[in-house]
Amino acid sequence: DAEGDKAGRRYAAYDLTKADGQGKWWEGYDPQKLYGGYNMIVPDGISSVKEMNEWHDRHDGAWMERIPEMNPEFARNWYRRCKQLIDDYKPDLIYFDDETDLPMGKYGLMATAHFYNSNMKWHNGRNEAVANAKRLPEDKQRGVVMDCERGALAGISPRPWQTCMCIGNWHYDRGLYGYNGYKTAERVVKTFVDIVSKNGNLLLSIPVRGDGSIDEKEVAFLHDFKAWLDVHGVAIFGSRPWKIFGEGEVKMQNSKSFGDNEKLQASLSEKDIRFTQKDGILYAFVLGFPSQKTVTIRSLGRNSEQMKGRKIRSIRMLGTKKKVE
């Protein structure tokens, strides 16, 4: 604390040791190992937030997940904790929330390998595990599913990938609840369909309150999202990308940083079409209600590159038995 009532005092974790946990919920754990220990310690004598920020900018202002040069034991302990988590809880998916590549160098590879090998033992030799990491180099995309946080790709990827997004913030935000700041089901559906058309998957977060519950607005969102899936899920689950992901006005680039395609995804409209295919059926999603009640899909025109040697046998609209004219 640089300027507050307790200026000069350090946070509790600085002084706590394993012995201090006796009789507490964290008994048996050493805070110095959990929080990194005595590394890059802020010196005494800093008396303003400005001065504190300047110190951090000089010494630890960059987000990094590499092995700390002055504390390699931290990375080894991180691996042991990952291994225990895998062994104790047998997760189906592990998300490494790093800035780029797998975290902690060789220990990130070791943790991922242990996850995959353990999963195969749990499933009679079949690997059903999914590990996520961000902005992976090409060679690692063959073994780890790349995640674009609140982002997207420009086109179809030959390998499965993922977007993670949240209907609000990554933590529960009472302010967003108060002014109805959650994303609508319609907004999320646009992103969802765009992702699936490009061979991607959506990891969607519904923030929980401190007691583990969700509020009634989040429940309403889930009901709306489920209602859409009840009708359109047949064109999503088990589907594959078509020859092209779609057509329209919105043009995206491959995400290079957090959230850099989110506004473009929100702007998808009736003029944007996305395709999926399954069991010999082509599905076309119109990402907005047609104001003129007509839809033109140029990629399905008789003279289009995609339709050479092909004919449309019939057209149906999901959710209704009415004839499409």
Language model regions located:
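Mature catalytic domains of secreted/periplasmic carbohydrate-active enzymes
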Residues: 1-325
